[in-house]
């Protein structure tokens, strides 16, 4: 956790440098007193870094997302870093079984020559940490270059949708979304929501569920369609900021 917060400056730098690096973020309590319980506040910090952000519910999700994350992040029209996030304790401090892929398959090969940002000699050693010198000035071209590059990074994140949807079987999962009461969540909050739904149904209350798998890109249209019949939407989160509820609103 402290590693993520100490590395915050690097995340937007990776995105701006178009480096398809993957990090696995284990979301546990970040404030004192220390806790290994889930706390997705640091995911809130990652939302505007230019990274892809996926949120695993289970150990199986985490395993699958890690492998599939490389495939998406390394696409030439994407080529930005990805954070595969999972929740503390329920995923990080428990044991579970996962289904492994067949032994005779491997990840798609990565071709560095299809990098959308050519590596120039002045940038190659040890790694292209900084863009061309002309942007390091206080003038219009410096501002315009920086601003337009941020838009390109956001566009790259959006372009990842078409690669992500077939790999993850959609950006969301839906269960009984025709009901008037819905729970919309991500990560292990979805697992706890399923138990809440089971208890509510025992009392005659029918509740549907929407599981969000990718936070960046955020499935705005998918969520809008899934919740179009809902009169009440509950968004359980393991953080004090309520960032997922704001995205859904």
Give the role of each language-model region:
Residues 22-26, 55, 83-87, 184-185, ...:
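Short beta-strand segments
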Residues 64-67, 94-97, 194-196:
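A short secondary-structure junction signal
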Residues 16-22, 41, 48-51, 76-81, ...:
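Short coil/turn connectors at secondary-structure junctions
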Residues 57-58, 79, 108, 240-242:
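Phosphate/diphosphate-binding loops
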Residues 2-3, 25-29, 87-89, 212-214, ...:
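Short, ordered loop/turn segments at secondary-structure junctions
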Residues 1-41, 46, 51-74, 155-249:
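Thiamine diphosphate
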Residues 81-173:
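Conformationally flexible catalytic loops at phosphate/diphosphate-handling active centers
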């Amino acid at each position: 956790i402290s590693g993520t917060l100490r590395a915050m400056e690097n995340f937007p730098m990776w995105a701006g440098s178009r480096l398809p690096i993957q990090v696995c973020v284990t979301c546990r309590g970040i404030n004192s007193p220390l806790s290994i319980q889930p706390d997705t506040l640091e995911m809130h910090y990652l939302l505007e870094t230019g990274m892809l952000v996926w949120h695993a519910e289970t150990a199986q999700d985490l395993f699958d997302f890690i492998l599939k994350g490389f495939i998406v992040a390394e696409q030439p029209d994407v080529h930005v870093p990805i954070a595969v996030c999972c929740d503390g304790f329920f995923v990080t401090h428990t044991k579970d079984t996962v289904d492994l892929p067949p032994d005779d398959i491997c990840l798609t090969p990565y071709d560095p020559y299809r990098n959308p940002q050519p590596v120039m000699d002045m940038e190659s050693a040890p790694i292209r940490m900084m863009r061309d010198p002309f942007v390091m000035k206080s003038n219009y071209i410096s501002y315009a270059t920086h601003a337009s590059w941020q838009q390109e990074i956001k566009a790259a994140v959006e372009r990842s949708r078409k690669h992500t949807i077939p790999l993850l079987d959609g950006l969301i999962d839906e269960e009984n979304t025709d009901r008037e009461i819905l729970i919309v969540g991500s990560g292990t909050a979805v697992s706890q929501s399923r138990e809440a739904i089971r208890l509510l149904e025992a009392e005659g209350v029918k509740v549907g569920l929407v599981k969000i798998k990718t936070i960046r890109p955020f499935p705005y249209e998918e969520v809008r369609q899934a919740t179009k019949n809902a009169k009440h939407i509950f968004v359980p989160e393991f953080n004090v900021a309520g960032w997922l509820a704001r995205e859904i609103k």
